[in-house]
A protein has these predicted regions:
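Active-site rim elements
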Residues: 34-45, 57-62, 137-144
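C-terminal cap/loop subdomain of S1 sulfatases and analogous C-terminal strand-loop tails that border
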Residues: 3-9, 13, 48-51, 56-126, ...
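Short acidic-hydrophobic sequence patches enriched in Asp/Glu that either
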Residues: 17-23, 43-46, 63, 67, ...
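Intrinsically disordered, low-complexity polar regions and short flexible loop motifs
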Residues: 133
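Histidine-centered active-site microenvironments of extracellular/periplasmic hydrolases
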Residues: 1-39, 46, 99
Length: 176
């Protein structure tokens, strides 16, 4: 599935942003031998999970250095998320300046919140309460009532960047 393009949401026209219109898309898997028809899940998954999932179902060892995680434990358990499953999805876009004019940014998305950092030639943070504001219209970054969760998200972001070995976003500029 492809999430398509913005149609004016957030004032944009592209799909490289970390907003829901760009990030959320359906994943449909049919494998009657192991997956019960009609199963659904709200587990946080990413495209890096596809390869380990296919390897796992094929009975092939998953390399230890692969970034994703197999979705098999979720798929064969009628969509139930294991207790030790990831708490956030990580996203990093670093191709600016390019024809799309999308600023470099990275961030995490948990079940309840999203934290985004635009960097390089700007330094802007956005944070959204996805339960109270699913359309991401009200940036709550820096608001006192969100200070505790903001601190937790900042720590989770750093931990997630270390996990995916993406700890120095400015290094991407040197490569490009």
């Amino acid at each position: 599935s492809d999430q398509g393009f913005f149609l004016g949401e957030h004032g944009w026209f592209d799909k490289r942003f970390m907003y829901e219109e760009c990030q959320r898309m359906p994943l449909i898997i049919r494998y009657p031998k192991a997956i019960k028809a009609g199963s659904t899940s709200n587990a946080i998954s990413m495209n890096v999970d596809f390869a380990p999932t296919f390897l796992d179902f094929a009975g092939v060892d998953i390399p230890s250095d692969i970034q994703g995680a197999s979705l098999k434990p979720i798929l064969v358990n009628e969509g139930k998320t294991p207790a030790d499953w990831r708490k956030a999805a990580y996203y990093h876009y670093y191709e600016y300046p390019a024809e799309h004019s999308v600023k470099r940014h990275y961030g995490i998305r948990t079940q309840d919140f999203k934290l985004i950092h635009f960097y390089n030639d700007i330094d802007e943070w956005e944070m959204y309460d996805m339960k109270a504001d699913p359309r991401e219209m009200n940036n709550v970054f820096g608001k006192p009532e969100y200070a505790k969760v903001q601190k937790e998200l900042m720590e989770l972001l750093q931990d997630t960047q270390k996990q995916y070995k993406d700890t120095d976003p400015d290094e991407k500029e040197k490569v490009l």
